[in-house]
């Protein structure tokens, strides 16, 4: 696997980009998560960033990438509506792992947004998408630009939802390389990694939450529910950051 030209790949249509990365992805599928991170740092351009929602299994990718690339900027898009336990988890992991945390927020405060638009998350798919654009997508785009990112690591896994089931290890999104080192991990592998390194799940895991986002669009898992039904009232799985 040789170095890849981001500018040249960005000029290709999306289908052609996928084809151009196919051989590299076939090789990356054979590597461990740690080897994928090391390969990316050697063969893909900097600056490098890692995004995290500080969700249920967030400690895995934060620990894995940060131990190989200490001080990598960790991007959090803060909506202002996270659970108190999430903010506490952020503080705990930032201190424990010595994270270089970079917090990005919408230009409008949560209160101002509600005054202007009402409660967007109660306005169906269109409202949820507008909410996500304001609070997730725009802040992430700004983060990637300000941090001059060319390679973006994230902790997505295929097992998490149907929308993630066929994601490759390496892709191009928002004009930068996107690397998913633990994309093929199952829940058992996540658990074993956490145990091995003395790490914890998000505090709400013990209360029956399989996925954690904002207070108003996250539900506890109940028997018969798919994991994606615990977010956005089952209308959407993705918050917008990992789409497009």
From Swiss-Prot:
Q: What is this protein called?
A: Phosphoadenosine 5'-phosphosulfate reductase
- In terms of superkingdom, the source organism counts as Bacteria
UniProt GO MF annotations? phosphoadenylyl-sulfate reductase (thioredoxin) activity
Q: What does this protein do?
A: Catalyzes the formation of sulfite from phosphoadenosine 5'-phosphosulfate (PAPS) using thioredoxin as an electron donor.
Biological process terms in GO annotation: hydrogen sulfide biosynthetic process; sulfate assimilation, phosphoadenylyl sulfate reduction by phosphoadenylyl-sulfate reductase (thioredoxin)
Q: Which organism is it from?
A: Salmonella newport (strain SL254)
Q: Which family does it belong to?
A: Belongs to the PAPS reductase family. CysH subfamily.
EC number(s) recorded for this UniProt protein = 1.8.4.8
- Supply the Pfam families for this chain: PAPS_reduct
HAMAP family in the record, alphabetically? CysH
Intrachain S-S bonds: none
